[in-house]
Amino acid sequence: MSKVIGIDLGTTNSCVAVYERGESKVIPNKEGKNTTPSVVAFTDKGEVLVGDSAKRQAVTNPEKTIYSIKRIMGLMINEDAAKEAKNRLPYHITERNGACAIEIAGKIYTPQEISAKVLMKLKEDAEAFLGESVTDAVITVPAYFNDAQRKATKEAGTIAGLNVLRIINEPTSAALAYGLDKKDSEKIVVYDLGGGTFDVTVLETGDNVVEVLATGGNAFLGGDDFDNKLIDFLANEFKDETGIDLKNDVMALQRLKEAAENAKKELSSANETEINLPFITADASGPKHLVKKLTRAKFEGMIDSLVAETITKINEVVSDAGLKKDEIKEIVMVGGSTRVPLVQEEVKKAFNKDLNKSVNPDEVVAIGAAIQGAVIKGDVKDVLLLDVTPLSLGIETLGGVMTKIIEKGTTIPTKKEQVFSTAEDNQSAVTINVLQGEREFSRDNKSLGNFNLEGIPPAPRGMPQIEVTFDIDANGILTVSAKDKATGKAQEIKITGSSGLSEEEINNMVKDAELHKEEDKKRKEAVDARNAADSLAHQVEKSLSELGEKVAAADKENIQKALDDLRETLKNQNASKEEIESKMKALSEVSHKLAENMYKKDEPNTANDKKKKDDDVIDAEVE
């Protein structure tokens, strides 16, 4: 069995790890870094850039550079979070089958397809590092991700050519990495604040058991929101000073985003920073520059309400676990946004305890995922991971009420049944509307999908017995079935429609990804050939210049013609590897012929010189 990789598919950055020779370690990408920006860009030349190369060109290509795609993963277009994303992100968010999608140059891409491109890069980097093909993976998601978001994440893995063995929660994964070697039982809190999501989880670890006691969070709160507060502040200040709204200029907005992100990072270690963006825009009076000093205190004032929200969630989750704060042994900080000093101060104050910073907040989740992969494969034995469902699951019943079948905090995998009946006399069919959430009424919760159970025999209301079964697998993905106990008729739904993609669409995307992988490979080969051709042309031109009159006129003409042909081919940006190599071969042949002729031309002179030297030698003996 090949190695299993663990992937932390993050909002801002992603990370991949592997378990080998008794330890889990992070795999560096081809650029030599341990994390890869979760950024995908489409260039005007038709190239698809992923990671650092995509992030570097974001300012000049904002509408075709996709970042924070995780924020709309598994979202329907009419959800509030989708509307917020549309207002915030520079690229065009649209819909496909009612679910969020993006439009680039007239083509529709789902969040799954964009995430798949990030996953494909991580897969390729892992294969290059390990020297073998990799298909099996464990991918992490925020603990508070709902069924649709989990399903969409798994689909992204499938499109990327991965066999997703398990979807596990990020804080659980972090706890696995942290607590695997702990022999004594201890209760810990994992506070996970990433780029786009927040989770807090209470776990019990020890003796190779990691058990989730309670979890909660916000799938739409993270470092991006800290950045957005700062972007709003800078844009509003600039508008007050100049009357120009930078939010209407996507290129300026992208520069603001980068500046905000950098300022946030600088203020984690400094008390003051300067944001300096020359030529941010222009009006009739000339170019405008944005220069603003920002103190840490000012920044903390902008984000304090967001941090306070995370502290409120801590209190709820510790209470849900049936614990008091003084029973918590360790607070493990996970996610890049936990580097913000205010976050650390407030969490420390909440527990009146020093924080555990022994783990790398950017890498620990991937490391834990790799351990889980090794558990599934059998390389790590006697480790038990007991996770829970973050939200209650149920169905809509009479009066638009949500009736819960599986309560939040239930250990998964799990299976539960409940018997319902009809609401009207002689009702021949029932519609099962599957819901996820904590509110009392159906309309306030998320509908995951619905299906009909038909062919119920005529009977007075309340008489038929319809057994509804909810089955959650180890990935936290739900299957619901309904059965009429009198007739045995049954209907089942695996919640697939919630992600907006059918099985056929996913298969098509897998094929499309493979096709583009081949296209990308050909494009890379063409780039390599182009670089080699440039090098050859330069070398030949240099040799011609150095040899000057020593080159025969006919040879010079042939070489120049081959050079011109090669240069002309290189002007065509769509020239294939084969076309370039053909012209290179022609140039190599005439330049090699030239070298041979030059050698032959010099050879007789060498012989004559030798003869002349020999003539000067006196044949005599020396005493």
UniProtKB/Swiss-Prot annotation:
Residues 595-623 are annotated as: Disordered. Residues 595-615 have a biased composition (Basic and acidic residues). Induction: By stress conditions e.g. heat shock. One of its GO terms (molecular function) is ATP binding. Signal peptide: none annotated. Belongs to the heat shock protein 70 family. Acts as a chaperone. This is Chaperone protein DnaK. It comes from Campylobacter jejuni subsp. jejuni serotype O:2 (strain ATCC 700819 / NCTC 11168). The gene is dnaK.
